[in-house]
A protein has these predicted regions:
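Surface-exposed, glycine-biased beta-strand/turn segments
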Residues: 20-95, 102-107, 122-131, 136-137, ...
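Short edge beta-strand/loop segments characteristic of extracellular beta-sandwich folds
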Residues: 229-233, 374, 415-417
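Exoplasmic/lumenal beta-rich domain surfaces
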Residues: 95-130, 197, 207-217, 244, ...
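Bacterial N-terminal signal peptides
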Residues: 6-17
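Proteolytic processing hotspots in large secreted/extracellular or virion-associated proteins
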Residues: 346, 387-418
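Short beta-strand elements
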Residues: 328-352
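Surface-exposed, short loops/turns at beta-strand junctions within beta-sandwich domains
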Residues: 311-317
């Protein structure tokens, strides 16, 4: 009997400690409660954002705070990337990162200066485990700045899993006041054939019926595979900056076909941002999340069935429900129907267009330039039409490869310098 009670108490103790570890709250890295200009998982031009960007009011030199008792594990000084950056390890298996700093506190700055002299190098990327530079929660460790690849003064802050080095959503560890769900800006449907070709993207008109529920009507689509795109963004209290969506799910006739929860990212996957966003809309400053695509299954925050596609048979109707949420659980919902009509017509290429199959190696030729593509370089078949433009003032010719509106994904561009 006592053995059973002891085992029960041990189990409760372990469960209790595990809950504490998962709900460990950190201090904010700036005094008071700073405003966000960028959040975790946000769609950037070339990558998914792996941290939070805190506003500093256009100023440099604000004290940066140690968010939890820890030790300096790494220091980096660079003209690019995070610029002057600190990495602190903490109990509980997490590492915090502070980027674009203007300077370090004297205890750290003295060590960094000695390393620079010894290596005869301004740029430093040093393991600091032997220096035992420990700080308590609330201590000032550095000052905010604009170093590295920064577009203006701000603090970039990350939380990482120390063992896997995956980036974790810092808002899981910070107390956030937010009472408004994500905004719904638009809904798009992409009808896809077996080859990967599609009809021009169709926008679904939806109306806010109250309580953040948006309803659309019955949308006629070619029978076959249909992908859903959601134009959405989020805001936090007292900030005008558009932020990325935390949670997004799609259900077809009650069955979940896509689910995204931005809690964790692997750095070797952040380049897949162009599989998660509609690039054509992004160029027009619209954030449209694509909830379909075979490559999406590689992203840690994403889970999908059948590539996230909705199967619509001829003369059938499919009920679609889309749920969006922020990390505080504030939600918005979209509901509409897809009605299957005639299948897609056979693809016809216009002059100058070429169909690139994703599973085959191929090449594009235009004037004196050739672009070679390896097999699987593209997520889906793409119809492209390369064009060459010249800028005489800097002797640069640019080859831009555009999709023609007949395919799922846009092409890419590359430059050739003379």
């Amino acid at each position: 009997m006592w053995r059973g009670i002891g085992a029960l108490l041990l189990m409760l103790l372990l469960l209790s400690s595990n809950v504490c570890a998962q709900t460990d709250t950190l201090l904010y890295p700036l005094k008071n409660v700073p405003l966000l200009s960028g959040n975790f998982g946000e769609l950037r031009a070339t990558h998914l954002h792996t941290g939070l960007d805190f506003k500093t009011g256009g100023r440099e030199g604000l004290p940066v705070i140690c968010v939890k008792d820890g030790v300096v594990a790494r220091v980096k000084v660079s003209a690019t990337g995070y610029g002057n950056a600190l990495y602190l390890e903490h109990e509980g298996g997490i590492t915090t990162v502070y980027g674009h700093l203007s300077r370090f506190v004297p205890r750290i700055a003295k060590v960094v200066r000695n390393i620079q002299y010894n290596k005869e190098s301004f740029e430093v990327d040093e393991n600091m485990s032997g220096y035992e530079l420990r700080f308590r929660a609330g201590d000032t460790i550095a000052y905010s700045g604009n170093t590295g690849s920064s577009g203006g003064p701000h603090l970039h802050f990350e939380v990482r899993d120390t063992k896997s080095e995956h980036a974790l959503n810092p808002l899981q560890f910070l107390s956030v006041k937010d009472q408004t769900g994500p905004n719904v800006r638009g809904v798009y449907v992409y009808s896809v054939s077996d080859e990967g070709t599609r009809t021009p993207v169709r926008r679904v008109e939806v109306k806010n019926t109250g309580n953040r529920v948006f309803r659309g009507g019955k949308v006629g689509v070619p029978a076959g595979m249909v992908g859903i795109g959601i134009q959405s963004d989020d805001y936090m209290k007292d900030s005008w900056n558009k932020l990325g969506v935390y949670g997004l799910s799609v259900r077809a006739n009650g069955q979940e076909v896509f689910k995204m929860t931005m809690n964790e990212l692997s750095f070797d996957q952040t380049f897949l941002v162009n599989e998660l966003k509609d690039f054509h809309h992004y160029r027009e400053n619209r954030l449209v999340y694509l909830t379909f695509g075979n490559y999406l299954g590689q992203l840690l925050p994403v889970r999908n069935q059948n590539g996230g596609f909705v199967s619509v048979e001829k003369d059938s109707v499919v009920d679609v429900a889309v749920d969006l949420s922020d990390i505080n659980g504030n939600c918005s919902r979209i509901m509409f129907q897809l009605w299957g009509k005639s299948p897609l017509r056979e693809l016809v290429l216009a002059d100058g267009e070429k169909l690139l199959m994703n599973h085959q190696s191929d090449s594009l030729k235009k004037e004196k330039y050739t672009l070679w593509l390896e097999a699987d370089a593209l997520p889906y078949p793409v119809v492209c039409k390369p064009e060459v433009s010249s800028r005489l003032r800097d002797s640069v010719e640019t080859i831009e490869v555009f999709s023609t509106g007949k395919q799922i994904y846009p092409g890419t561009g590359f430059c050739v310098d003379h």
